[in-house]
Each structure stands twice: as C-alpha cells, then as structure tokens.
Amino acid sequence: MILTDNEFALIDVREQGEFATSHILTACCVPLSAMEILMPEMVPRQDTTIVLVGDCFSSRYNLLQRAATCLHELGYQDISFLEGGIESWHDTGYLLFSGINTLSKAFGEFVEATYKTPRIDAASLKEKIDLDEKILVFDARPAEEFRRISIPGALNVPGAELLYRFFEIVRDPDIQVVVNCAGRTRSIIGAQSLINAGVPNPVMALENGTMGWHLAGFELYCNQTDVLPVPSEASMSAAIHCTRKVAKRYGVKVVDRNKLLEWQNDTISKNLYLLDVRSPEEFI
C-alpha cells in the first residue's frame, strides 16, 4: 500500500514517547488519548482507508481495538490493523525508525546532501559576530519558539516568511545571512529556500541551531519579542519576482478560487489540506 498512489492513513496509536523509540517511517502518531482531537484535522475525509498500528503492548491492552471504536464513533468506517504490529514489520525485514518528525528530518538531510547547502558552526558564527562582520541571523522558528530561547541579535523570521521579509531587512548584498532553528532541518530548508530563490547575499544554515549554540557554551536570550515591519512595496516586488522564478523553475502549480472550491466540494476523491502560511495574527 505504501508504494502505491492509493491514499490511506497509517496511524500509530501509541503515545509519542513510545512512538519515538521505534516506528514505521510513514506512520503518523495519533495516540488514543488525543485521537478525537487530532483525527478530524489529520484525516478529514471519513471514508479514507485507515490502518492502525501499535506494538505487542498495544495488542495486550486492547489499544488498537479501543482506537478503532473511537474512530467508528467519529464516523470513520474503513479501518484495519497491521497484523503483528511493528514487531512483524521488523521481523519481515523492514526498517523501524526512532525520533519524531523523522520523515521531514530525512527530507532536510536529503536537501543538504543534494544541494550542498552551505553551513556554519556555532563557534564560527560567534567569531564573526564578535569581529563585527556584516552578518544577520534569521531564526526560522515560529514566534512562540523564538520567545522561549534565541541567539543574541537574531531576528525572528519564520520559515514561510523568509523570502517575504528578506529584501526589507537585507539592504546590503555583502551581508552574510545565517538561518537557524532549534536543530538542523528548518535551518537547512530555510537557507536552501533563499538560495534557490536567487537572493544576492551569501546564505548559510547554522549547524545544530540553538542547541549547537548552547552546547558550544554561548548565551541564549529569552522572551525576545521584536516585531518586524511590514515589507515595503519595493521589497514585496523583489520577493514576488524571486517567487515567480522559483515557481517556474520547479513547476509549482497555481489554482484559482473556482478550482479550490471544486476541491473543497469534492468529498469522495482525496483528503484536501488547505494551509495558511501567514502568522496567527494575520490569520485571525
């Protein structure tokens, strides 16, 4: 099923801690304790084929059966179990993975290996800052994470806003831009996105993000709440120009409102996910 184009949901019903120790790469963690809240958003179409998976513990304590009952009560009908759970998956010779957000992290590593995304370690970045070099640090995490901890002097530019805000902030082509996150993945994706967009400045990903900065013994700030200005018309025009070039280069498709409405009214084909990439304030 995984190797076909047929849509189905592979749902791991264990708690995230158990899931993180060992799971199938393409499985989504929807623990029984949060199933009623998470499933309607994750799998909006109720006739979607759903495969539930757990481990021996799950079977022993009827977690799978209870999860199936919960899903039936929510309106889902096409539900089955992976026979033997993750143990049978492993015994058949297939890999199991540890951690969370494993698939997206693997994608980040693939991007870095494919594009040779430039990177800089914490010590080298600190040296550049101390030498007062022309450098800006963009923290690509959401505002809530940025407020928790951040690198001194970093600007909070969430990943989806990097190009949107770039030309308003970076006015000198000699400025070096470093993109950071908490670890690696969002730094890599953010930096490579700017590079692919053709911005004129040198761009690098901060290796291991705020975690690497902390492990190197450098100070982290808390409760930073600086709000960046809305980009000017000229900055927006430059960002839009880069966006269109990227869309053309990679064949990004565009749909009009009528097509979107058609998809929203289609309840029998596939699940539709409509993602608003603006800030929570703009969304509200």
Which residue stretches match the model-derived regions?
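Rhodanese-like catalytic fold shared by cysteine-dependent sulfurtransferases
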Residues: 1-9, 13-136, 140-273, 279-284
